[in-house]
């Protein structure tokens, strides 16, 4: 019976969901083309060394051995292969890339997550200006409103803020990591115990409130202004304020929040981070950020970059649930009426041809599809 079973964390896609997903991918690719992004496709298989510098979070890699004895992996991420491509080909920079492809991650058992995910994304490489973040945020705003009916909230953060705050408390890297882990995992009792030794420090009141440091920008910035934060975080806060002000001016309908108590979406981010989610769906619809040091793992010279990935599968689930169900029509005809049937089909967006041998078979097919039967024979069949 195993030959009928799918591997854990995978699924077949068929019918309405498959059509919806194909449509969303076409819309995304058209949007990328309209913005001048160069399409890029990297192999499903990569050398494991491509992903060695980074811990890939709460999941493992699919590994296999190549003929040359090297360990290969099914790519768990799209950004690192793009970085590998840039370094290997010496493609001139700056460049804007757009992609759609599948990634593979072995999730924890019983997590409810799929191990195969279709992701679309943008990589803007060689751009140090904040304009790169602005373009990614614009793409996210425009695509989310075009692809699904639900309002999407964009959550902003900073990859270096938390690390710089704890570094101002202690030089002990183990202690720093323990505090950050408890903070990011929302282990409040453990976090409270870890910060207790800093009770005499001016920053202690901020530390106590830190696990709840998320919400509307105005409230968060007011709270931050009252805290004696180290100078090392001021550039991050200024950048956040600049981005929020820009978003409020250019996309006033967009709901924005700030979260400085959560871990960055990827460990290689170095600056502004952003995520988008809908109240109707579990998980983030998209996430991204700046990663100015990623290419140093493949070459000596660093390159500034901003990237973003969209979860096409989650977008498909939301879009499928929101679609209006249209009554399909099933066209029955005799072989000599083929041209007439094709002409009718061309005018009806929700019609399909019945290939049944006789009218009785067409009626059974229409009932199964819950479709209206259009009989071009007028009941005068050759059966």
From Swiss-Prot:
Pfam families named among the record's database cross-references: tRNA-synt_His (PF13393)
Biological role: Required for the first step of histidine biosynthesis. May allow the feedback regulation of ATP phosphoribosyltransferase activity by histidine.
According to UniProt, this protein's pathway is: Amino-acid biosynthesis; L-histidine biosynthesis; L-histidine from 5-phospho-alpha-D-ribose 1-diphosphate: step 1/9
Identify the GO cellular component terms for this protein. cytoplasm
Q: Where in the cell is it found?
A: Cytoplasm
Source organism per entry reads: Lactiplantibacillus plantarum (strain ATCC BAA-793 / NCIMB 8826 / WCFS1) (Lactobacillus plantarum)
- Report any one BP term from Gene Ontology: L-histidine biosynthetic process
Mind listing the UniProt keywords for this protein, alphabetically? Amino-acid biosynthesis, Cytoplasm, Histidine biosynthesis
For this protein, the record's NCBIfam families field holds: hisZ_biosyn_reg
What name goes with this protein?
ATP phosphoribosyltransferase regulatory subunit
Subunit structure, interactors included: Heteromultimer composed of HisG and HisZ subunits.
* GO MF terms held by the record: catalytic activity, acting on a protein; histidine-tRNA ligase activity; transferase activity
């Amino acid at each position: 019976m195993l030959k009928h079973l799918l591997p854990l964390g995978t699924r077949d896609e068929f019918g309405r969901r498959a059509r919806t997903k194909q449509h969303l991918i076409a819309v995304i690719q058209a949007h990328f083309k309209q913005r001048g992004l160069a399409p890029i496709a990297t192999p499903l298989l990569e050398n494991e060394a491509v992903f060695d510098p980074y811990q890939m979070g709460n999941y493992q890699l699919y590994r296999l051995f190549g003929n040359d004895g090297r360990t290969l992996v099914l790519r768990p991420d799209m950004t690192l292969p793009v970085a590998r491509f840039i370094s290997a080909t010496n493609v001139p920079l700056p460049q804007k890339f757009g992609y759609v492809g599948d990634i593979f991650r072995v999730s924890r058992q019983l997590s409810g997550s799929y191990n195969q995910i279709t992701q679309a994304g943008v990589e803007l490489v060689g751009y140090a200006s904040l304009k790169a973040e602005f373009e990614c945020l614009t793409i996210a705003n425009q695509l989310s409103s075009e692809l699904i009916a639900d309002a999407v909230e964009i959550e902003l953060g900073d990859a270096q803020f938390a690390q710089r705050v704890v570094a101002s408390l202690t030089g002990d890297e183990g202690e720093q990591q323990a505090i950050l882990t408890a903070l990011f995992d929302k282990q409040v009792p453990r976090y409270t115990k870890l910060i207790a030794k800093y009770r005499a420090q001016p920053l202690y009141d901020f530390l106590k409130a830190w696990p709840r440091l998320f919400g509307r920008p105005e409230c968060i910035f007011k709270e931050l202004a009252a805290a004696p934060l180290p100078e090392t975080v001021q550039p991050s806060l200024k950048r956040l304020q600049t981005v929020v002000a820009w978003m409020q001016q250019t996309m006033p309908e967009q709901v924005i929040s700030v979260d400085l108590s959560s871990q960055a979406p990827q460990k290689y981010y170095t600056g502004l981070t952003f995520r988008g989610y809908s109240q109707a769906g579990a998980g983030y619809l998209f996430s991204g950020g700046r990663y100015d040091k990623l290419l140093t793992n493949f070459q000596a010279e660093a390159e500034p970059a901003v990237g973003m990935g969209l979860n096409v599968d989650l977008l498909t689930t939301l879009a499928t649930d929101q679609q209006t169900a249209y009554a399909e029509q099933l066209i029955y005809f005799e072989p000599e009426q083929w041209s007439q049937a094709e002409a009718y089909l061309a005018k009806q967006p929700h019609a399909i041809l019945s290939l049944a041998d006789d009218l009785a078979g067409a009626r059974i097919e229409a009932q199964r599809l819950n479709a209206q039967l259009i009989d071009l024979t007028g009941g005068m069949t050759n059966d």
